Amino acid sequence: TVSRARADFGLRTFGADGGRLTLNGRVFLLRGEANCCVFPETGHPPMTTGAWREVLGRYRAYGVNCLRFHSWCPPEAAFAAADELGMLLQPELSDWNCTNALETPHSAAYYEAELRQILFCYANHPSFVMLTLGNELCTGEEGHRRMAELVRLARQLDPTRRYAGSSNGQYGEQGYDGVSDFYTAAAYGDRMLRATSSPMIGHLNRCRPGTRQNYREAAAQTGGVPVFGFEVGQYESWPDFDQIDRFRGITIPENLRAIRRRAEQTGAAAYWQAGVQASGELALRCYREEVEAELRTPGMSGLSLLGLQDFPGQGTALVGMMDAHLTPKPADFARPERFAAFFAPVVLLACFDRYTYEAGEWFTADLRVANYGRQTLAGPLCWRIAEGRTILGQGTLDAPAGW
């Protein structure tokens, strides 16, 4: 024997049918999350399967079934852990060029080499299901031509996965590129694919709160290509200052210290914990509306969040249910089971016009079941409207077999 190698592998099909992502032939709903390579103690990602098993387990507790790696590709230990846990992964090439992506021969050659290496090294892992060429890539005609060539090359090298030119390419302004296997963006042209975006647009900012909004018009623009939301959420909560002492590695939390000093100077420290809980509860409710709006949209393949983990880059983005250390925040709003209640394979939806009614007005709602579990639901759906212990109305409906 000259040499010997051992590799684990798995068999699965990840494709598309009727404009929807499918996993082993069944319609699949992406409950994704963006990981931005935030590891504040070490400054680099874990390199062992055990450590990645713990990282992925934290995400899975919140209902995540697919992890997107924002403009980077994790080590093989991440893929091995995902294989064990049944998680799916979407790595990206390390490109975040918002001006002239792939327009030079040098950059095109570099990213082609990276693409070939990723597919060569990780092709045996069934958890590896999608890849994009980078994050929010913007470019000119030559760059788009090279991006299309790389997508076709990836498909030729390994047709068992789905590929796209970019995540939120051209910020969604130009729509589908005509070559990618899926479309993920914040919008399709001027039609939103999430509830909020800059500058204060989206139905959460501009419409009366209710539960009938969806993204049907935007999702229908891709011409039968699967579509899912990009970096959905980004709702912040006040920081918990107790976490400051846990920064013992290379990251200095001077941003959190500055906020604490201001709170002490203005007197806000006296009611700070109440503010943490209130802002976090609002963030949780906004995340729920984001998720349920996607579920209310026929034809969408899900969404990818940003994010469940606080993001200390680009200033301070305290957007997570978990802090920068991937630890659930010590507050009721951040309990994993609360988020997973609506970020789940099966979710009951009540669609109504608004949350506030006056005495004498009729309340009407449509009940739906978003079922992306492994089993078809059968039997009656029981509903009840109550005020305290007083039942105002109740009944049963036939449960639809999926949505």
Model-derived features: where do they sit?
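Generic detection of short hydrophobic beta-strand segments and adjacent strand-loop junctions
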Residues: 7-9, 174, 395-401
